[in-house]
Amino acid sequence: MDKRDLLDRLAANGDERLLLGRVWDKYEQCRRRNIPVVTGFLSPAEQELVRRLMGALDVREGWLLWGGYDTAQRRQAHFLPDWQTEPDFEAVAALRATFYEPNSLTHRDVLGSLMGLGVTRESVGDILVAEQSVDVLVTEPVRRFLLDSWDSAGRVRLKVQPIGPAELQVPEEKVKLLRDTVSSLRLDSVLSVGFSLSRSKAAEAVTSGKVQVNWADWQKPDRQVVQGDVLTLRGLGKCVLEEVGNQTKKGRVFITVKRYL
């Protein structure tokens, strides 16, 4: 398979092509040297690109995505040699920063302070903000750097210490299950259920470029979605087509959509 042609087919722009090229190089390094190789942290959209690349290469085993805990949003791609069956869990390190004033930091505050120290985005995984602490997933070299260098976020003073994966304070997901029937599994129909919109408003959101399916832009309201697809609507959040059920006597389809609050 010609590498250039495949990258051109999978990537929508230069940034995506560059990312896929780097990931492909990591995969080839693993196969050629038979050693574990890990990428930086990837956004959900970037993870979907990696899945498409691995699918195109027909690679179904020997790699996985991991971000430090089961429901992590940002994850690394781990490519495993033939002698390894699990990823190097230590490639994802964690630390906790505590502060005195409750609810005085946001995700943006924390990320901004890390970027201000010169930490790259791909070196940082999920940022889990609690009332008087924040847990941050990073690469091990960055954890060592932050333990020595990170003592504040804006005007908020921090006390930073390393923690293990079992100590992570993962916020409980707040979701709402929405059940309805649709005439078909068109994107605009499912979107209207997930975000309580009229069909016309849902279609307008799609055509105006506000909607992503599995973190890829999609502007065709009649696109068919399938169970498990993640739908994101700019400004309103995301939902998942959780279940596709049987048809009613009139031919409509029962669906369950999980809306993240």
Give residue ranges: language-model regions.
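Basic (Lys/Arg-enriched) interaction patch that binds polyanionic ligands
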Residues: 184-235
